[in-house]
Structures are given as C-alpha cells and as structure tokens.
C-alpha cells in the first residue's frame, strides 16, 4: 500500500473495484483545512475518465506494471494485433485500450504496460507524434487565407485531420497523437 504522497502521472492503481491510470494530479494544501490530492483517473477497462479527490495520507493500492515495446501489426475488427519487439510474442488488444487507434500505422512502436500479477495488458502509450501521408485533401479555396483557415484531410490510416490550406494529397504530415491535431508538414 502506498499513500497519496506517492501519486505521480502514469501510476496504475486499484480503486473502486477497477484499475485506473493517473493522468493528472495536483497536491493542494489550503490555508484552512487538511491537504488533499486532486486526480484525474482513466479506467483501463472502460476508458472513462474520472475526477477524484484523495485526502492527504489516504492509502492507495498500487499495481505493479512492466513496460514493453510492441510493434503494431494489423487491425482486425475491434482488435489490434501487436508483436513484442524482444520476444516476438503476439498479442491482440481491444481498441478501447488505445488512445488514438485511428492513427496507428503498421510498424509503429508503442509502449504496453502489463500487470505483473495477471500478465494482462493494462494500457498502451502511443508515440508523441506520428508521420502519415495524406491520401485525400479537400481543395483549398484561394482568398480564404485572412485567418487560420483549415480544411479536412484523410491520412493513410483513414483518420480525418484538419490541416492548413497548403497541404495537398501525397504530402506527409506530423500529427500529435494526444489531440489528433496537425503539427507540421514533413519534408523528405
């Protein structure tokens, strides 16, 4: 058992008969009253995000996890297949456990957290950004550049992304996996 002073981002805990990953936390010590910790928890079984407040010194049940590098192989319905980069063992994960399944390209390396007690995958950390090719881009209308004008584009994985007007089919773009937004055009 750990206490609230051990809370950090990425920590996996057992709480309310479910397994959660701490996304954000803030230690608060008000002028009046006891200290507490505000947390944002993501359920690793359902993917729902929950706000919770722990009082200072509250005991939390930490789950031991190991992190391994896996390579994305292919999607099959709601299942996504990965291969361990070290042991070449293959696993399939439901798309609910992934943050941005529509941005996964074959060969992308991800970090998978595995519960050491049950050997079940808990969560998948995507790379911070991915580089994908634009397969379809709406034509940009000239004269609409007074403000930050954007248009819809489809990338090779099938995801839709808002991009600036100068992006055309065949361009490679860098996409932020956390927000799914356009970052920059990549020159080869």
UniProtKB/Swiss-Prot annotation:
Keywords: Cytoplasm, Elongation factor, Protein biosynthesis. It is found in: Cytoplasm. It holds the Pfam family EFP. Signal peptide: none annotated. The keyword Magnesium does not apply. One of its GO terms (biological process) is peptide biosynthetic process. One of its GO terms (cellular component) is cytoplasm. InterPro entries: Elong-fact-P_C (IPR015365), NA-bd_OB-fold (IPR012340), Rib_uL2_dom2 (IPR014722), Transl_elong_fac_P/YeiP (IPR020599), Transl_elong_KOW-like (IPR013185), Transl_elong_P/YeiP_cen (IPR001059), Transl_elong_P/YeiP_CS (IPR013852), Transl_elongation_fac_P (IPR011768). Pathway: Protein biosynthesis; polypeptide chain elongation. One of its GO terms (molecular function) is translation elongation factor activity. Involved in peptide bond synthesis. Stimulates efficient translation and peptide-bond synthesis on native or reconstituted 70S ribosomes in vitro. Probably functions indirectly by altering the affinity of the ribosome for aminoacyl-tRNA, thus increasing their reactivity as acceptors for peptidyl transferase. NCBIfam families: efp, PRK00529.1. PANTHER family: ELONGATION FACTOR P, ELONGATION FACTOR P (EF-P) FAMILY PROTEIN. Belongs to the elongation factor P family. This is Elongation factor P. It comes from Flavobacterium johnsoniae (strain ATCC 17061 / DSM 2064 / JCM 8514 / BCRC 14874 / CCUG 350202 / NBRC 14942 / NCIMB 11054 / UW101).
